[in-house]
């Protein structure tokens, strides 16, 4: 990393402001973040220092902000892409402990904080991205629900914590992209909270909002009642996106065991959901059976009442015919009273007939609903049986892999013991070889000495032989 340039002797307000901005974002403006395939590249910028030159140009602050926007956009691309791929490979609902999801929220928090204006309060200056997020409910009415939920959470005490909770609820609602697009399109409202060259005010913000659409395929579930969102430190972990050339792949057996464990957990979770659904459907079937029995009883009572009314109607008809004949000779007022009584009886009969039709229609509806529930129960039972068979098969595979792992470990221990024994034997053989080599050298030296002695004796003998002659 290049050395930091020393500060100038006479700082100005402009240089102090630029220095403060560079100090806050040293991890962004000191490097250029770019993408190489699926990996993150950090390239050092030798021409950027914490303190600008004594005579800075007007383009330096804009250059720093543009570099920060580009870095944040590339980080957002990598974070979103990695989150989608890992979530699809995982194949289950994500929670707050999932590391790629945590890093995504950290990157989004940095994007929302970029170029944020400081609000002056009696405690000092405060930068919070909760203010812009509160505007979303005015632009998209659906966001009012999560805003109210965030405000009602008892554990949140700071605007930063509320903003983090809002991001999590929007992701759970699968509306984060829609909310961000609506917010970015209203730059006249954002100008109250952001500088003119902030990420949310430039093209990079719109690009990030478009990338967020891909997160709609992810299912996430957060429990924020016990989570401390106020005091979390939002630091981007670059190690998740940097390629390690010396990294070695795990053993194939461990990878298979991990995959089978994930499948087993998924099947068990699915089995629990299916069992809960079956229990709910069974409760509904019991309730429908009780309702059906009650409706059958009411229908029987209504049929008996209809029969009684029909008999009464026949009797009333006979009486009315008799009264008509008798009243032809009677006063006109009596005939009018009898006509009114007959009209009331007909009206009452019509109401009872309509009631019977309504009861029969309700009974048919309940019967059809019961048949549908029975069919759904059969299908769910079949699905549960299939999932249980798959679970048994996965458990068997897991047991086989564990046995294979133990066998390989035992063989490895045995081979290590054999290697150790062979090493000891080899050491002994080398020691004996060294001893034999030393003995051979001694024997050779002795042989040389004997040869010398033989030569000496021979020469002495040759000298003695002439003397005797």
From Swiss-Prot:
Domain remark from Swiss-Prot or TrEMBL: The second coiled coil domain is involved in the interaction with GTP-bound ARL8B.
Function: ARL8 effector that promotes the coupling of endolysosomes to dynein-dynactin for retrograde transport along microtubules. Acts by binding both GTP-bound ARL8 and dynein-dynactin. In nonneuronal cells, promotes concentration of endolysosomes in the juxtanuclear area. In hippocampal neurons, drives retrograde transport of endolysosomes from the axon to the soma. Plays a role in the generation of neuronal polarity formation and axon growth. Implicated in the formation of a single axon by developing neurons.
Phosphoserine modifications at: 34, 49
GO BP terms, alphabetized: actin filament organization; cell differentiation; negative regulation of axonogenesis; nervous system development; positive regulation of axon extension; positive regulation of axonogenesis; positive regulation of cell migration; positive regulation of intracellular protein transport
Domain RUN: 95-227
Phosphothreonine modifications at: 5, 12, 51
Self-association state and partner proteins as the record states: Interacts with PAK1. Interacts (via C-terminus) with Ras-related Rab-5 proteins. Interacts (via C-terminus) with Ras-related Rap-2 proteins. Interacts with PIK3CA and PIK3R1. Interacts (via N-terminus) with FSCN1; this interaction induces neuron axon development. Interacts with DBN1. Interacts (via the second coiled coil) with GTP-, but not GDP-bound ARL8A and ARL8B. Interacts with dynactin/DCTN1 and the dynein intermediate chain DYNC1I1/2. Directly interacts with DYNC1LI1.
Primary localization: cytoplasm
Subcellular location: Cytoplasm; Endomembrane system; Cell projection, Invadopodium; Cell projection, Growth cone
GO molecular function, one term: dynactin binding
Name of the protein described by the UniProt record: Protein RUFY3
Name of the coding gene: Rufy3
């Amino acid at each position: 990393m290049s050395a930091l340039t020393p500060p100038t002797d006479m700082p100005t307000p402009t240089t102090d402001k630029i220095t403060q901005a560079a100090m806050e974002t040293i991890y962004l403006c000191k490097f250029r973040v770019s993408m190489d395939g699926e990996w993150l590249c950090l390239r050092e910028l030798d021409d950027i220092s914490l303190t600008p030159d004594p005579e800075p140009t007007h383009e330096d602050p804009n250059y720093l902000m543009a570099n920060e926007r580009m870095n944040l956009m590339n980080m957002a691309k990598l974070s979103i892409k990695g989150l989608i791929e890992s979530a699809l490979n995982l194949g289950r609902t994500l929670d707050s402990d999932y590391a790629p999801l945590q890093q995504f929220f950290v990157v989004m928090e940095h994007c929302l904080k970029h170029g944020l204006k400081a609000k002056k309060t009696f405690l000092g200056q405060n930068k919070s991205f909760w203010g812009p997020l509160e505007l979303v409910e005015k632009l998209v009415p659906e966001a009012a629900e999560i805003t109210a939920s965030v405000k009602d959470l008892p554990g949140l005490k700071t605007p930063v914590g509320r903003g983090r909770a809002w991001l999590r609820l929007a992701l759970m609602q699968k509306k984060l992209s829609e909310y961000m697009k609506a917010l970015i399109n209203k730059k006249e409202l954002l100008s109250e909270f952001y500088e003119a060259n902030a990420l949310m005010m430039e093209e990079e913000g719109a690009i990030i909002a478009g990338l967020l659409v891909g997160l709609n395929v992810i299912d996430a579930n957060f429990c924020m009642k016990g989570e401390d969102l106020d005091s979390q430190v939002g630091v981007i972990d670059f190690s998740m996106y940097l390629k390690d050339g010396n990294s070695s792949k795990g053993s194939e057996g461990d990878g298979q065991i991990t995959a089978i464990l994930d499948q087993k957990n998924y099947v068990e979770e699915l089995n629990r959901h299916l069992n809960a659904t079956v229990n709910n459907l069974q409760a509904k079937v019991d309730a429908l059976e009780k309702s059906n029995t009650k409706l059958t009883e009411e229908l029987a009572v209504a049929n008996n009442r209809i029969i009684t009314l029909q008999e009464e109607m026949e009797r009333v008809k006979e009486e009315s015919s008799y009264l008509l004949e008798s009243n032809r000779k009677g006063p006109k007022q009596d005939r009018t009273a009898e006509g009114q009584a007959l009209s009331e009886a007909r009206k009452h009969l019509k109401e009872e007939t309509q009631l019977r039709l309504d009861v029969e229609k309700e009974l048919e509806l309940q019967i059809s609903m019961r048949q549908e529930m029975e069919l759904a129960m059969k299908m769910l039972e079949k699905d549960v049986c299939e999932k249980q068979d798959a679970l048994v098969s996965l458990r068997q595979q897991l047991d086989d892999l564990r046995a294979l792992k133990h066998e390989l470990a035992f063989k490895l221990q045995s081979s290590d013991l054999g290697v150790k024994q062979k090493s000891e034997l080899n050491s002994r053989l080398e020691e004996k070889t060294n001893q034999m080599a030393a003995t051979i050298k001694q024997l050779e030296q002795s042989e040389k000495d004997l040869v010398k002695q033989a030569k000496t004796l021979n020469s002495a003998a040759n000298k003695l032989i002439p003397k005797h002659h």
